[in-house]
Amino acid sequence: MSKNKLSKGQQRRVNANHQRRLKTSKEKPDYDDNLFGEPDEGIVISRFGMHADVESADGDVHRCNIRRTIRSLVTGDRVVWRPGKPAAEGVNVKGIVEAVHERTSVLTRPDFYDGVKPIAANIDQIVIVSAILPELSLNIIDRYLVACETLQIEPIIVLNKIDLLDDEGMAFVNEQMDIYRNIGYRVLMVSSHTQDGLKPLAEALTGRISIFAGQSGVGKSSLLNALLGLQKEILTNDVSDNSGLGQHTTTAARLYHFPHGGDVIDSPGVREFGLWHLEPEQITQGFVEFHDYLGLCKYRDCKHDTDPGCAIREAVEEGKIAETRFENYHRILESMAQVKTRKNFSDTDD
């Protein structure tokens, strides 16, 4: 990881956090500053409890404690940390994370108990992995795309297992993927088994921090293992060889480096993005091809369904918007309403 010089704004934030920590430490003792060396730059490659693994500028990984004044720390955060000094009895003291730089982006997911929960930071792009088996679901792809648009993180759609397609199947799948190509999304067709299409994907990942999203069974872990060039798999397979059905993993989010350049954060928290915390207007904005027609409906409170004078529905009827996308839009709204109803019912039970 290259060592970046702090900007004036970043330095001010680090100093402000440090002063806030010093103020808090007067009220309640934190860690002894004499136990730690000089501040350095680093990136969080994994977080668990009150500890984090921080990679320094020279590529070494250090186990660190986290200052109590740091309110949020996730994999991908760029931090100021200090190494621990050797203790008198020869045991090394853990390092300490002192401050967190401002995030360029934050990947969040809704949580019934904690509201919106951050799971990764400074993501450049989300790689949406789908596959023809167990089944190709455009509805799930559309859910991921809405999440990406809401988070303002660039998506790439990757269709895996293309080696299982014959010519007729490939033509059909390409027709489905053209729906997304035509509205500006990048689509890559790959096979982690034969490694077809991996070179363009590797090029798209170079120099960027990515996170792979996909349901169990799409071959996400196999794809990551192929890209990482691992001799021994360190990412748990997300599909059972015997049944063909997906199985869950419980590992914490962790950042890995691609040999061709670029990084990936592997996290079990992005198998499926919940959208129930969003408002219907945010879902509408999440369909990029709707933008040209928003505000053109006859009624301001148009639900974009059977309402008379709906500009979006008319665009669908004229073939300007894909019917499958329009149908999935309403499926997402319906599923959101159902989840919110269950959540409200559960809250009243408490």
Curated annotation (Swiss-Prot):
Pfam families: RsgA_GTPase
Binding site for Zn(2+): 297, 302, 304, 310
Localization (cell): Cytoplasm
Enzyme class: hydrolase
SUPFAM superfamilies from the UniProt entry: P-loop containing nucleoside triphosphate hydrolases (SSF52540)
Transmembrane segments: none
Record: residues binding GTP: 160-163, 214-222
Cofactor (UniProt): Zn(2+)
Cellular component GO terms, alphabetical: cytoplasm
The UniProt record lists the keyword Glycosyltransferase: no
Cofactor note: Binds 1 zinc ion per subunit.
Boundaries of every CP-type G domain copy: 104-273
Molecular function GO terms recorded: GTP binding; GTPase activity; metal ion binding; rRNA binding
Biased segments, Polar residues type: 1-17
PANTHER family: SMALL RIBOSOMAL SUBUNIT BIOGENESIS GTPASE RSGA, SMALL RIBOSOMAL SUBUNIT BIOGENESIS GTPASE RSGA 1, MITOCHONDRIAL-RELATED
Function: One of several proteins that assist in the late maturation steps of the functional core of the 30S ribosomal subunit. Helps release RbfA from mature subunits. May play a role in the assembly of ribosomal proteins into the subunit. Circularly permuted GTPase that catalyzes slow GTP hydrolysis, GTPase activity is stimulated by the 30S ribosomal subunit.
Protein name, per record: Small ribosomal subunit biogenesis GTPase RsgA
Annotated organism of origin: Shigella flexneri
